């Protein structure tokens, strides 16, 4: 059974495009919360299951921690663009963007990483919405987009159809997709659409599917 997606209800501000992007990020990686915070520590928007006030406080505190880290004189720390902090009860990821903006993500329990595909998609969409340049360190993940896939009735890890241009598009499996970016528990395929386009599909550990350079999204 597919997990129920989070919603934008129970908020203390009107939903924005930023909130929708962060909501999808939370759903993609199972995160309890995610927030976009500006250089002054103000939360632009957020998503998650926590109280909005708690999300705002956490976002401001971690944005300050990221700023302090980037201001220190230790070699390699001042240009940190991605920081993971693991605590006894909660863990967080801090993602630096242009002009002092940052994404603060509370990680799923016992996790110390986040899907680079989900993160790359969120960064791309947030930067487009905010008029920011995508950081160079995330350009390599710019081609991945989360998609809906109908799995084979014989094997849920094998794709049968892709939701494409308003309908289910049958897929022709050409072979396995193998690359260093595949993590433990992930499986990839090279597929052909009925349009003749060939794309890479990856199923991540949480059952989310991602397509690389899908024509309708590029």
Task: List each model region and its residues.
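Acidic surface patches and DE-rich sequence motifs
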Residues: 38, 87, 97, 193-195, ...
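Generic low-polarity alpha-helical segments
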Residues: 34, 65, 166-170
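Acidic, low-complexity cytosolic segments
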Residues: 1-33, 40-138
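Generic beta-strand hydrophobic packing signal
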Residues: 34-35, 83, 162, 176
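Cysteine-centric segments in proteins
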Residues: 136-218
């Amino acid at each position: 059974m597919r997990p129920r997606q989070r919603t934008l209800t129970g908020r203390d501000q009107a939903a924005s495009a930023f909130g929708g992007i962060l909501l999808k990020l939370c759903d993609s990686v199972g995160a309890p919360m995610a927030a976009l915070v500006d250089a002054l520590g103000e939360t632009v928007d957020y998503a998650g299951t926590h109280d909005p006030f708690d999300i705002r406080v956490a976002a401001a505190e971690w944005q300050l921690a990221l700023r302090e880290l980037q201001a220190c004189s230790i070699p390699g720390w001042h240009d940190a663009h991605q920081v993971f902090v693991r605590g006894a009860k909660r863990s967080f990821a801090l993602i630096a963007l242009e002009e002092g903006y940052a994404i603060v993500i509370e990680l799923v329990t016992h996790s110390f990483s986040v899907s680079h595909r989900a993160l790359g998609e969120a960064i791309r969409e947030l930067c487009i919405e905010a008029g920011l340049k995508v950081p160079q360190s995330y350009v390599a993940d710019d081609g991945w987009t989360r998609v809906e896939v109908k799995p084979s009735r014989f094997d849920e890890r094998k794709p049968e159809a892709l939701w494409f241009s308003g309908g289910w598009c049958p897929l022709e499996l050409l072979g396995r997709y193998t690359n260093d970016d595949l993590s433990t528990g992930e499986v990839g395929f090279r597929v052909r659409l009925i349009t003749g386009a060939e794309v890479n599909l990856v199923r991540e550990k949480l059952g989310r599917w991602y397509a690389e350079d899908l024509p309708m999204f590029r």
